[in-house]
Amino acid sequence: MALPVLFDCDPGHDDAIAIVLALASPELDVKAITSSAGNQTPDKTLRNVLRMLTLLGRNDIPVAGGAIKPLMRDLIIADNVHGESGLDGPALPEPSFAPQTCTAVELMAKTLRESPEPVTIVATGPQTNVALLLNSHPELHRKIARIVIMGGAMGLGNWTPAAEFNIYVDPEAAEIVFQSGIPVVMAGLDVTHKAQIHAEDTERFRATGNPVSTIVAELLDFFLEYHKDEKWGFTGAPLHDPCTIAWLLKPELFTTVERWVGVETQGKYTQGMTVVDYYFLTGNKPNATVMVDIDRQGFVDLLAERLAFYAS
């Protein structure tokens, strides 16, 4: 039986590829997709969800737009990474259908209520929508199997020296998620920076030869340019968000540890930092499964295998 999934995202090149991977995987039943503000403004990330689902021929999936800003802060976007549209590079189709008239939180709550079994929430942007859901619907916590997030790191950052972008945008929301009592799975920079897609991998995807694999290759062409900056020391583009979906499909590709994680919301230098109690110094019970390593080649092979799905 397919695993029911709610997908909250802020497309974003890597979010878009995570959508492609999820919808090529019969192991997953994506019940709804909600958009968050982060990689681009909320109107653009919502439109990008609709554009991707139009490309994939999946206008049957309900879509709703989420919060327009973080819980307590002004919005920060990553247009320097993802471009003016949020998905610069390929020529994507215009949306062929409209989003739901309800909010993201309302769609999430409806989906949870109607599901006969607990649902896995995958969140690959800031945690604002998920935190709002948890705060406004405590009665639905029991309907959430786990929350799988892309965010955070153990001791490094990609937006500040201490903070990863998704957590930095809305640290208060992330803290609500981590302390909710619901199992959290964290795909942080420790693992996603190892999930690099090289130029030869992109050409492998392109050679698959279907319209979706071509778009994915063109997304990666654009995404790779930003990551060529010498400061990163990368040999490719880290494909952050698809790690969440890959973990659901093939957890054996990842090395994980069970640890307590908190989020710094006040620090002068460390705002947005995920504090991972690696050596059990706090005495706090672990609240997260933290990914620390990945079989990169296995990850690339999984992407290539699932891109072939779209040939049919």
Curated annotation (Swiss-Prot):
EC number(s) recorded for this UniProt protein: 3.2.-.-
Catalytic residue list: H240
Presence of keyword Hydrolase: yes
SUPFAM superfamilies: Nucleoside hydrolase
GO annotation, cellular component aspect: cytosol
CDD domains: nuc_hydro_IU_UC_XIUA
Keywords for this protein: Glycosidase, Hydrolase
Enzyme category, top tier: hydrolase
Gene Ontology biological process: nucleobase-containing small molecule interconversion; purine nucleoside catabolic process; pyrimidine nucleobase metabolic process
Domain of life: Bacteria
GO molecular function, one term: purine nucleosidase activity
Extent of the signal sequence: none
InterPro entries: I/U_nuclsd_hydro_CS (IPR015910), Inosine/uridine_hydrolase_dom (IPR001910), IUNH (IPR023186), Pyrim_hydro_RihA (IPR022975), Ribo_hydro-like (IPR036452)
Tagged with keyword Iron-sulfur: no
Similarity comment: family membership: Belongs to the IUNH family. RihA subfamily.
Physiological role: Hydrolyzes cytidine or uridine to ribose and cytosine or uracil, respectively.
Protein name: Pyrimidine-specific ribonucleoside hydrolase RihA
Organism: Citrobacter koseri (strain ATCC BAA-895 / CDC 4225-83 / SGSC4696)
High-level lineage: Bacteria, Pseudomonadati, Pseudomonadota, Gammaproteobacteria, Enterobacterales
Gene assigned in the entry: rihA
